[in-house]
Amino acid sequence: MDEIQDIEGLTRRALQAISRIDTLRDLTKLKNDNLGSTSWLAKYSASIKILSQEKKPIIGKAVSEARRKILEACQDRDLALRLNAQNEQFTRETLDITALPTRIFPGARHPIHVLQDKILDFFLMRGWSVVEGPELESEWLNFDALNIGPFHPAREESDTIFAEPRSASMLLRTHTSPVQLRALVSNPLPLYCVSSGKVFRSDPLDATHTPVFHQLEGLVCDRNITLGHLKGTVEDLAGYLFGAEVNLRMRCNYFPFTEPSAEFDISRDGIDWTEWGGCGLVNSKVLSMAGIDTVHYTGFAFGFGLERTLQFIHSLSDMRDIVEGDIRFSQQFGLK
């Protein structure tokens, strides 16, 4: 049939033209010319209804086959053109990953962690060991084993964050002192150890308090330990952190887990004093809880907050600056 030959010839020409197309715009135009509402295929489709019953299926099949071939060719060419354009873009935008950067945005360790490591190094160089304990602690180790009685105000929910269910007697530790008991029970004597980590209180965030902060605590248990050993240790640490010109004083105080107890303050001028931490000889009841022979062994303990220490070193007036992540604060510690 002449119609079949015409359709096949037009299809071949369309396929050849599609294979030579170089742009998506030209491909769209060619697709409309061959498959659009005014294309030659549309005219053949419209003419089928006036053909004889014998020709209708033959011409209809030829038109459908031509439309399928042209449509597939357009789709294949469209994909090829898009891939070529993408490859050309990649070639134009190739980056030399070995080139030296023109700008560097270095990070930095948080100043609390830097200070923590500095203090731990101080004790490691003196032969002390570093011990750790869990942040989720038992109420017995956090309070009872440290001679903190059942009616002590520190055990109120207004001061302590208890875990649910309350009957489990578990809490977020309020100090690092429970590590003392763990260290005394699991290590042979004499013992010289230091621990540091997060502690938790039900305190609002303000200039001098934060509900999550870091404590560092030292513990010694040996024969013939005295307050002189304690005072000398704290003085050496203060000189190491703040310089030889720093002033240190101790004031009598009360802590259930030490006896006698004291607080120690620091000052640069000897006039304005900053409370730094607490200390004392380990209470014999605490040593007994750990199974220590209190006739032959005594010990001392001291502890302080790292945030307050950092405030004194860098003359920071607001503790919130340390925890809120303000870039203007972080820049002075190397973060850019």
UniProtKB/Swiss-Prot annotation:
Binding positions for Mg(2+) per the UniProt entry: E259
Keywords: Aminoacyl-tRNA synthetase, ATP-binding, Cytoplasm, Ligase, Magnesium, Metal-binding, Nucleotide-binding, Protein biosynthesis
Catalytic activity: tRNA(Phe) + L-phenylalanine + ATP = L-phenylalanyl-tRNA(Phe) + AMP + diphosphate + H(+)
Co-factor(s): Mg(2+)
EC class name: ligase
GO cellular component labels: cytoplasm
Protein name: Phenylalanine--tRNA ligase alpha subunit
Source organism per UniProt: Tropheryma whipplei (strain Twist)
Gene transcribed to yield this protein: pheS
